[in-house]
Amino acid sequence: CYILMAVLSAVMFASCEGFLTKPPQTALSPDSFFRSASDLELWTNKFYSDILEDTDIAETYADDMMGSSINTVQKGTRTASSKSWSTPSVDGNGYISSNGTFTPLMNINYFLEHSSNCQDEAVRERYNGVAYFFRAYFYYKMVRQYGDMPWYDYVIGSADTESLNKPRDPRGYVMMKVLEDCDKAYERLPEAWAAGPLFHVSKNAAMALKARAALFEGTFRKYHSGTPFVPQDQETYDGKTISSQWFLEQAVEAAKTIMGKKSLYAGNTMGIAPIAKNASYREFFVLEDADPNETILGRAYKSDEAVTVRHGIQFDMKNGKRSATQ
């Protein structure tokens, strides 16, 4: 009898332990995710909408689109005293919110910490390249807006008060890290993706971002030298002495990497017969598909029901979902 009870108790405890260690049913577990190419693609696809600049062409406070209700502009009641003007939201740290402020950065660093779950090295490194590109883009945007910024290349735990309260890093150090991330992206990204080559970051996109970021920082330091924005024009980080000249040289070298790889659309190269002297200019606005030879990183804007990412406004306007009565 005692033996039977001992056996039953062992079985019961074993079953309870197995139940308690089950993976979460309503949330992603890093141990079971980030294992396949589709997992990595799904996670990194969010970076495009979170970090790239928003270029929606319709505006509910203009004449080209209306929301579900008449707004203050359309009613003629929007005035300075009514305080109905849109202002950017500010989080508790005083940073203007942009899709959750540091949330996109956390998602990038979280991805880089767990992408090693994918055993296919070629796939893993390709999507790591996407993450490095967008971390560089994220910090490039933040430095443009705020100057000095705290640099994080890891996920901050809720109890890590030291990291949460760390002071800002000098903009020169952060921009140096931006260029390093561009180099990491360039090493890992393909020349072009098999599917949607125009709309995925590539080697050319990484070098274009590096050239843009380095040119911005180099000219900023050149024309603000000696001001509180640039206390000293030469700084040394990780053994590198940086200055306005250093950033400008980095911009030149990055630009040289992609020069000659793209060509401007000259017309009549996609099976479309020119109908006028300025046909190429006309086709720039009427072609359904862009010429890939002149595009480094683009977006597709089509009124196609199958296309919903970043094209919802066009979809809504085509189908009459955006109007004064709908």
Label for each model-derived stretch:
Residues 17-79, 149, 200-204, 212-326:
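An aromatic- and glycine-enriched ligand-binding surface/loop that stacks and positions planar moieties
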Residues 13-15:
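C-terminal motif of bacterial Sec signal peptides marking the signal peptidase cleavage site
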Residues 152-159, 230-231:
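Short, conserved phosphate-binding/catalytic loop or strand-edge motifs used
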Residues 37, 41-55, 75-146, 161-198:
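Conserved, well-structured interaction surfaces
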Residues 143-154, 222:
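Short, well-structured active-site flanking segments
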